[in-house]
Regions:
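SAM cofactor-binding core of SAM-dependent methyltransferases
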Residues: 1-35
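Short catalytic-loop micro-motif centered on adjacent basic/acidic residues
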Residues: 22-23, 50-54
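Class I S-adenosyl-L-methionine
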Residues: 33, 40-49, 56-171
Length: 171
């Protein structure tokens, strides 16, 4: 991934687009989002941000922190939701990461569908109006994760549909 990103960034900087700024950090995702949320000018409307959150596992991203960013800024969000981690660890009393991620003791999630619905409800805030989930499975058809895409504009969904169609050759 890093080599692909470096290649893309090199091409972007070579063309010198004055209205495109790339912000990269190697901080913990929650620290990173908190830092970005404190920015007052760089990410406010009419600036458009594409936020790609690909955590190490389900317990990594604090959803209220991600929600705050989505509420405050005009952005599109690509979020990797590790549903397999949740399914595997939901009944594990020792794994408090799930509770920490959700950060709401009143919320009880009983199955994967409720988890996805809860996440969408939490992230469809601010200008976010449209969403799309795409499940990724193993060769034995076990779901590993879902890519959640949220956007303020329906044209974002159209572009995503076209990209998925091109990538997966209509399959």
């Amino acid at each position: 991934r890093i080599s692909v990103l470096k290649e893309v960034i090199a091409k972007v900087y070579k063309t010198r687009l004055p209205n495109l700024h790339i912000y990269i950090s190697q901080k913990d995702v929650n620290e990173y989002l908190s830092c970005l949320s404190r920015e007052t000018k760089r990410f406010l409307y009419p600036q458009a941000t594409i936020l790609y959150v690909d955590p190490y596992d389900f317990g990594t991203v604090h959803i209220p922190t991600l929600r705050t960013f989505c509420e405050k800024f005009y952005c599109e969000l690509l979020f990797n939701l590790f549903t397999s981690d949740w399914v595997r660890n939901r009944n594990n009393e020792l794994d408090s990461r799930i509770d920490k991620v959700i950060d709401n003791p009143k919320v009880k999630i009983n199955n994967k569908t409720e988890l996805v619905d809860y996440m969408l409800k939490q992230l469809k805030v601010g200008r976010m109006q449209y969403s799309f989930n795409y499940e990724f499975h193993t060769e034995t058809n076990v779901e590993l994760y879902q890519i959640m895409y949220l956007t303020p504009k329906d044209t974002g969904l159209e572009k995503l549909k076209d990209a998925l169609w091109d990538t997966f050759k209509g399959a």
